[in-house]
Amino acid sequence: MKKREMEDMPLCKFHMKIFAYASGSSFVDGYSLGIIAIALSVMQSDFDMSVTMIGLLGMGTLGGMVIGGLVGGYFTDILGRKKMFIIDMLLLGIFTTLQFFVTDPTQLVVLRFLIGIALGTDYPIAGSLMSEFAPSKHRGALLGGINAFWFIGYAISYLIGYFLLPLGQGSWRWMLISGALPIVLLLLARLNMPESPHWLIKQGRHKEANTIVEKVFGQGVVVSHEEQEAKKTSLVDIFKNGYGKRTFFVSTFWSLQVMTTFAIGTYIPEILGQFGFQDGSQKYLGSAIINLFYLIGIFPALYLVEKYGRRPTLIWPFLITAIALFSLGVLSAGSTPFIFIILIFIIYGIFNTGMGSHQWIYPYELFPTHVRGTGGGFTTTISRIASAISTFFFPVILDNFGVSITMYIAAFLLMIGFVISAFMAPETKSMNLKEAGSI
């Protein structure tokens, strides 16, 4: 009787446990990036900071993530998923705790940069581990679902920050150290997780891999019938043997998607103000509604990505979001009702974050096991550079050229994403990792 492959096993509690480990990374990332925004608003009472220093504190984490994604992904393929998961979370907990004790802004900038390195490292670890344990039929939903926890972590950070504000002077210290709690809980949980059998096979450690598979799924289950040879990791492999095309595709679609996501999400109150909605309640209520639908848009995408596949759930949202932003550019010239503008932004938000789930799907399906972390880490790095650039230049363009031109530029970027995805996006629905990495 032929043994079953682990990717053919039905969804079970073990898969959801791995999902919790992986999505915890996304939650911590969102929380860390959100809480610094609240903390910065109250730090001025302790430190007399220049605009440059405030900018460095805000961008420090993103800067660290650029390095963390590149270096962390490579070491994830060298040292293993479990070992890197634990080391990374331990360092992240230490750096987060040390924020409480800083005596000047420069120390905090250094710590935020180190936190960014740790967060950037966690992306390829989480994506690799989830993809290598997930059943083929549910891999897209499980990987895409990780993205939802970024928004949850971000939202909770604002809630915690709000409740800590009454502590007054020094409340920012408690805000920043509050991020250590989920990190410690995640670290303790990860101590008992198994190593990826796919990674062990690539190291030639077949006996360990089979022992883990049998312990988790029982007798009669193997890692794979085909993937049995050991293979060493090299950074240049993601640019060779046809993988360069995949690296370009993932880096490009991911970058084009997050450039508008981060820029519009960060400056939505200012955008609504330029549409003529200067009333504070309108601006901030509108911002809250739009950001809420950023989260809501993920959930239908997790169903659709498994029912209809990866290609249509990436290609058509690119087109729909481009049309939505182009429409906003046209409408900015007239006097359009508030509710109508908000509805178009909601359409943009739902489809934008829906296709954003592919940030966690394609990078960890299209690269083979020996460079899966490297490929995921490299593309994470490129996307973070793109998001930092767009977040920096967006307000400059908005102030100098107005909301209409700004929306047209954003729509043009999304249209490029539509064209590239239409020509390059592969279909990996229901494929095992061997098949997805070979198309």
Label the predicted regions.
Residues M1-I439:
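Transmembrane-helix signature of 12-pass secondary carriers
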